[in-house]
Amino acid sequence: MKIPALPSSLVTPFHGFAILCGTGLLAALLWPDPLVRRVLFLHVLVFLQGILSLQIGEAECGYGPLPLGARLWRLLFFSFLALALALPFLLVYRAETAASWPSFLASLAFLFAHGFGWALVGYALAAVIRWEGLRFLAKYGGFLVASLVPLVFGWPITGLIVLPALWEGRGPGLLGLALYLSLSGVGGIWWWKKPRRFSGK
């Protein structure tokens, strides 16, 4: 398939994502507390990726009518592009934290599933909720709730827990990875089966 051009509405979010990832990495490397240093960049990364993915989904919904195959390809490609932008920072962080390569690859798989899943959420919200103010609240409010509430209770269903656990090779990370791979796969299949409702604005 043809490589999609980045929509103008996503140029600034992608630039901001790369800059903030670099800033988060620098802050993590310079942080004096070693316990915070081990997870700070991963927390920053997974949070920024979720926000960017929601913006990807919303922008894609407003791109115009496209065949579902092309639409799915664009969502997958932009999710991969976001991961590719983060990859150099992740490689530096792996060297600094001495994470194993299996843990590193599992973390990449999780980040892709996490990003694609939230891109589908952003797309669906943009297709269903037409009022911009309500959509903004649902999009970012829902993301904050889904990210922070499980963190308070220690549930391995938020990227803020899953990604550090995968990075360190702990069991809850594998559970979260399986959950996000399943949810993103089921979400993609469900979205594929609803062409009229989710055909774009």
Where are these regions (language model features)?
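Hydrophobic alpha-helical transmembrane segments of membrane proteins
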Residues: 1-201
